[in-house]
Every structure is written in structure tokens, then in C-alpha cells.
Amino acid sequence: ILTKFDKSKNKERLSEGQIIKMLVRYITVQKNNTTNLLKKIVIHRDGKLFSLERNGIFKAIQLLKEKGILPDDVSVNIVELPKHSILQLRLFEVLKEYDVLHNEEDDGYVLNPEIGSWIKINNREAFLCTTGREFKHNGSSNPLYIKYPIGNMDIEHIIEDIYYLSCLAYTKPDDCSRYPLTIKITDRRINIL
């Protein structure tokens, strides 16, 4: 996990040049500090990935391949994690059937999902419950929408990584975090700047 910060003139996006500069610099640092071959790179984008950012990512990867820092067959995977999805979905666990048309009360038979529950929409989209009934919060769990537009990893591995990173709730270790550490730490940093 590598999180670095850089100010941008544009509020919600980085320039192509910024992306190239940061990725080349910090992937080189990662390579210099490991004996392992860097075979998979996963980039988490808070919100929508802009075309200039995508271009910067692939230009940086190409430069790193040309320098011999990355192998030619490196897998580049990009995940978009919007704060708000246009698709609204709630997951529940129903312990016992009851007549929902006539009974307004569920008598405790409808619970928030277990943390880590997920549903795959297709090979490029899924919802993941990074919060759940194990942590007492008011309301229903709001699953995180995962969009995986670029890459060749199985979406199940992408979901698993995001779940594990969401368990790193360093600001409150006895609680859960809706967002993975890769997004949460950046949000906290931006709020300080």
C-alpha cells in the first residue's frame, strides 16, 4: 500500500503530468525496496477516473516498462469507488419469512447483513458491505459500490482487497469504516490541507 499526496489545480482531478511524475517516482521506490517482481498494480480512484488521469497512468506504466522497473506483462487494474452511487442497493438478512404486505414490524427477523457480505452485479461491478450488524450503528448498512472499468484481475479479488483495506479503521480500531484505507486516508489528508 502506497499513499502519496499532491496538490492539484483542479479540485477533483490530477493532471496527466502529475500522475506520470508520482507513479514513476513511487513505483520505482517500491521496486527498489523489494526483491519481488511487481506483477499487479491496483489503483483505487475516489470517484470517477478522468481520461487525462487514465492516460497518465498508462504513460507512466509504459515508461516504467521501458526502464525495466515493471515487467512487460504487468497487470494494471483501476477501481472507481464513488462516495454516492446512482444505483441504490440495500442488503438484508431475513431470518424468518413473514408477510411484508401486512406486517410493518419485522419482529427482529430482518437484520443488517454481516460485514463483508457482497453481491456481484457483473464482472465489472459489485456492492460490498464494509459495515454491518456486527457494529451497532443506526439505520441500514449502505453497501459500497465498486466499479472496475480497467484490468484483468477477478473482481472477487478486487472485492476482497477492498474489504480487507476497509477493516483497517486506524482512527477507531473497534469500529468499521465504509471506505478502504486507500480512500479514507486521502480524505482525511485533504480535510487537513
Regions found by a protein language model. Name each.
Residues 1-193:
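Long, contiguous domain-sized segments
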